[in-house]
């Protein structure tokens, strides 16, 4: 089993959970090996170079995928999916969902996602549009940026991950320190982002939001 890994702060709790889960060593090695940004893992899963990953939510809507109610979600604000004000339109090559979301929301400018976006927003939020905030303003709903998808063995992944949304993940200080240092962020900002902004359980409102987003994308020929 080959698992794709997105090495962003918002999935750090999941990485810690999987490291502690009693998986075969070979599986853990593969999970660490197949790293990539969302757009790369989208292609890797599509061509079955990996067996499962948290991929862009717009990509996860393909009928070929089996999905779990687990992903990257935010409500009212996300801080790490942005459009830079007063810039020319430009997609973030790391993303699929966020580029589509900017079009759905008719937000012009440069799309920026991930840890680099978080750093920029915290430095000067006035320069950026938070796309999750814009989505909530329009719909009153949360947003699902990515979703756990696989091509087979859904029951196995469901068994492995079923306790994750209910588990309080304790991230060792040295890991937080390393992530903060390598992203040029304060530890308190990393903690706030993980504790107060990002969550991973896809429930009824999140499913409603995702259906609405996919429908909007199809209307614009983005999906």
Swiss-Prot record:
Keywords: Lyase, Menaquinone biosynthesis. GO terms for biological process: menaquinone biosynthetic process. Disruption phenotype: Cells lacking this gene do not grow on standard rich medium; however, growth of these mutants is readily rescued by the addition of aminodeoxyfutalosine, but not futalosine. GO terms for molecular function: hydro-lyase activity. Disulfide bonds: none annotated. Its EC number is 4.2.1.151. It catalyses: chorismate = 3-[(1-carboxyvinyl)-oxy]benzoate + H2O. Pathway: Quinol/quinone metabolism; menaquinone biosynthesis. Transmembrane segments: none annotated. The keyword Lyase applies. Belongs to the MqnA/MqnD family. MqnA subfamily. Catalyzes the dehydration of chorismate into 3-[(1-carboxyvinyl)oxy]benzoate, a step in the biosynthesis of menaquinone (MK, vitamin K2). This is Chorismate dehydratase.
């Amino acid at each position: 089993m080959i698992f794709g890994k997105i090495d962003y702060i918002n999935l750090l709790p999941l990485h810690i959970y999987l490291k502690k889960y009693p998986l075969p060593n070979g599986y853990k090695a593969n999970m660490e090996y197949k790293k990539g940004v969302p757009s790369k893992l989208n292609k890797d899963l599509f061509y079955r170079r990996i067996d499962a990953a948290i991929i862009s939510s717009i990509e996860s809507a393909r009928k070929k995928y089996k999905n779990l109610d687990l992903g990257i979600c935010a409500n009212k604000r996300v801080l790490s999916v942005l459009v830079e004000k007063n810039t020319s339109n430009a997609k973030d090559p790391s993303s699929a969902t966020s580029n589509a979301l900017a079009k759905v929301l008719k937000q012009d400018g440069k799309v920026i996602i991930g840890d680099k976006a978080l750093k920029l927003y915290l430095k000067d939020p006035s320069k950026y549009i938070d796309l999750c905030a814009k989505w909530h303003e329009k719909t009153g709903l949360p947003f699902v940026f990515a979703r756990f998808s696989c091509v087979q063995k859904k029951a196995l992944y469901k068994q492995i991950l079923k306790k994750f949304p209910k588990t309080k993940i304790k991230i060792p200080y040295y890991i937080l320190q390393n992530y903060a240092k390598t992203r040029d962020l304060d530890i308190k900002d990393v903690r706030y982002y993980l504790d107060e902004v990002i969550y991973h359980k896809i429930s009824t409102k999140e499913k409603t939001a995702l259906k609405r987003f996919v429908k909007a994308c199809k209307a614009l020929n983005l999906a």
